[in-house]
């Protein structure tokens, strides 16, 4: 039985920098928080436990990256260089590039290679205090390759000190062998892929890319209906490039989240509020593809829709492995406040996964997953660009990452 009192710390237990304790302690037993609060109120039952002095550092919940595509083969830096030289995305696609090139590389990679490539993208997130990650499939687009991606995602959670939740995104794009036959491909997703992967226990949620260049409302709803037959929660890539009504559809199905949302309108915001659907904003993609349409943050505030922030880490539109950078981008590009972005990577991000009862906040009865920061103010988490701020990561009461000793 391991018992530890973490003390001499400043605590932000709910991810809200307006709700903090300046001199706090956390009592942890066998990886679970049994008490936390003002150090002066530490119960006598814990007074004799071994102590871990954090020297006045800030402690927040472990960060949650709630929308990633971390598992894939290859990268597309050469295409990035082509686009900078003026080659259009359409021309790159005609040359066999774009998402098809990632599908090709992912299908060709074996599990060991895919694991190594994906682990290299996960490790920087862990070093920034991330203890929970969502990972989507969607670059295999056939049963064997989607299975391989989800198996690798599960392995990352088993071999790294991070909790991984998997999302089946078979309806991400149309694979080359189904060109011109989108409905037939959705048949494959709903009738072959999802049943097999769900039966194997590889799927925690189901996503769909509902967009003019993705799948229609009708096709998206078929995927949602299939997910519901397996009692799997749903989420949606919606209103990124146009307002197609995807968010309203997601809300009707009580989606955990709707993500991107640059073209979201008031009716969609109202539907999200009614359904309890979280808005996941992805500033990395907005920045990388030079979008100009801002997500409707004022509407989301007015309707009190919870807003999460994530990396959207992927090879084509957001090759990002820094959640702290996304916090900075959300403040500078989207005009979000520091409290909004910190909750956006803690409590609201956990809610976007349907896991607010487990992650995103620190309280008695929950796993002792937290990040320790070398900062004077929590605003620094969104302020610095490229500066390593995380001194220590604690998962289930054990230090799993240390950058430097606190003093």
UniProtKB/Swiss-Prot annotation:
The record's section on InterPro entries has: Amidohydro-rel, HutI, Metal-dep_hydrolase_composite, Metal_Hydrolase
Query: In what pathway does it function?
Result: Amino-acid degradation; L-histidine degradation into L-glutamate; N-formimidoyl-L-glutamate from L-histidine: step 3/3
List of residues binding Fe(3+): 67, 69, 237, 312
Q: Supply the enzyme class, top level.
A: hydrolase
Entry EC no(s) = 3.5.2.7
Catalytic activity reads: 4-imidazolone-5-propanoate + H2O = N-formimidoyl-L-glutamate
Q: Which family does it belong to?
A: Belongs to the metallo-dependent hydrolases superfamily. HutI family.
The protein depicted here goes by the name Imidazolonepropionase
From which organism does this entry originate? Paraburkholderia phytofirmans (strain DSM 17436 / LMG 22146 / PsJN) (Burkholderia phytofirmans)
Q: What is the lineage of its organism?
A: Bacteria, Pseudomonadati, Pseudomonadota, Betaproteobacteria, Burkholderiales
């Amino acid at each position: 039985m391991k018992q530890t009192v973490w003390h001499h710390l400043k605590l932000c237990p709910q991810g809200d920098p307006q709700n903090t304790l300046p001199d706090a302690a956390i009592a942890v037993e066998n990886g679970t928080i049994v008490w936390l609060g003002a150090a002066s109120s530490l119960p006598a039952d814990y007074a004799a436990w071994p102590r871990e002095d954090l020297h006045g550092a800030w402690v927040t919940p472990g960060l949650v990256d709630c929308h990633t595509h971390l598992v894939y083969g290859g990268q597309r830096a050469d295409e990035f260089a082509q686009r900078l030289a003026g080659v259009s995305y359409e021309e790159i696609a005609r040359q066999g590039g774009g998402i098809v090139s990632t599908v090709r590389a992912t299908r060709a990679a074996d599990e060991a290679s895919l694991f190594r490539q994906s682990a290299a993208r996960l490790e920087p997130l862990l070093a920034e205090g991330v203890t929970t990650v969502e990972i989507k499939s969607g670059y295999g687009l056939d049963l064997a390759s989607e299975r391989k991606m989800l198996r690798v995602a599960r392995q990352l959670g088993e071999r790294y000190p991070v909790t991984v939740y998997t999302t089946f995104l078979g309806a991400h794009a149309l694979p080359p062998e189904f060109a011109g036959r989108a409905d037939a491909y959705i048949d494959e997703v709903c009738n072959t892929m999802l049943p097999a992967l769900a039966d194997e226990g590889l799927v925690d949620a189901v996503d769909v890319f509902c967009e003019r260049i993705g799948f229609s409302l009708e096709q998206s709803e078929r995927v949602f209906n299939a997910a519901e037959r397996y009692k799997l929660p749903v989420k949606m890539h919606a209103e990124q490039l146009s307002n197609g009504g995807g968010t309203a559809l997601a809300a009707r199905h009580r989606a955990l989240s709707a993500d991107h949302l640059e073209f979201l309108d008031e009716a969609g915001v109202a539907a999200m509020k009614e359904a309890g659907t979280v808005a996941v904003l992805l500033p990395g993609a907005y920045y990388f593809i030079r979008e100009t349409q801002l997500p409707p943050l004022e509407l989301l505030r007015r309707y009190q829709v919870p807003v999460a922030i994530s990396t959207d880490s992927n090879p084509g539109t957001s090759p990002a492995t820094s959640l702290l950078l996304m916090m900075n981008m959300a403040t500078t590009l989207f005009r979000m406040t520091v409290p909004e972005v910190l909750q956006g990577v803690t409590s609201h991000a956990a809610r976007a996964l349907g896991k607010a009862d487990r992650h995103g906040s620190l309280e008695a009865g929950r796993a002792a997953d937290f990040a320790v920061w070398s900062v004077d103010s929590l605003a620094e988490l969104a302020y610095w660009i490229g500066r390593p701020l995380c001194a220590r990561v604690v998962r289930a009461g054990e230090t799993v990452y240390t950058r430097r000793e606190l003093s």
